[in-house]
Amino acid sequence: MAKRNGSPERRKHKRLKVKEGSIAISIPDSKKLGQIKDISKGGLAFQYLGSVEQAKNSVEVEILSIADDFYLRKLPVRTVLDVEINNPVSLSLLPKRQLSMQFGKLNHYQKELLNHFLQRYTHR
């Protein structure tokens, strides 16, 4: 699969679109929270309101669904990209940003819960 700019895609896992109501929270900077845009076994991307000053590398991310009691805690991550995205209709004074993260080494329990999330909360 190729990226838009023509360079080869580097992801090992296909990103899946996530259903509404699935939220990611970056840890330790819990000011970065928002709707998950897409996710795979290798990482995720979510959008949040924030400024460049807030943009710090996260160490962990937590995933939850506001539709039910799903909560996946303390997934180790590495920030891949944190960019401002164009949002012409926003009423917020803060810019909209997208944070892309790669998962670190997950334990067995985290892998099981992530697989459950991928099955239940994504569009196939």
Where does each model-flagged region fall?
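C-terminal output/interaction extensions
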Residues: A2, V89-R124
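A generic structural micro-feature
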Residues: K14, E53-A55, D69-Y71, L91-K96
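Short beta-strand-centered aromatic/proline hotspots
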Residues: L33-I36, R73-V83
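N-terminal helix initiation/capping motif
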Residues: M1-V52, N115-R124
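Hydrophobic residues positioned within well-ordered beta-strands of beta-sheet architectures
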Residues: V59-V61, L75-V77, L99
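Short conserved beta-strand and strand-loop elements enriched in small hydrophobics
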Residues: G21-S26, A55-L72
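Short, conserved beta-turn/loop elements at beta-strand boundaries and strand-helix junctions
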Residues: K41-G42, L81-P88
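Short beta-strand/turn micro-motifs at beta-sheet edges
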Residues: L33, N87-S90
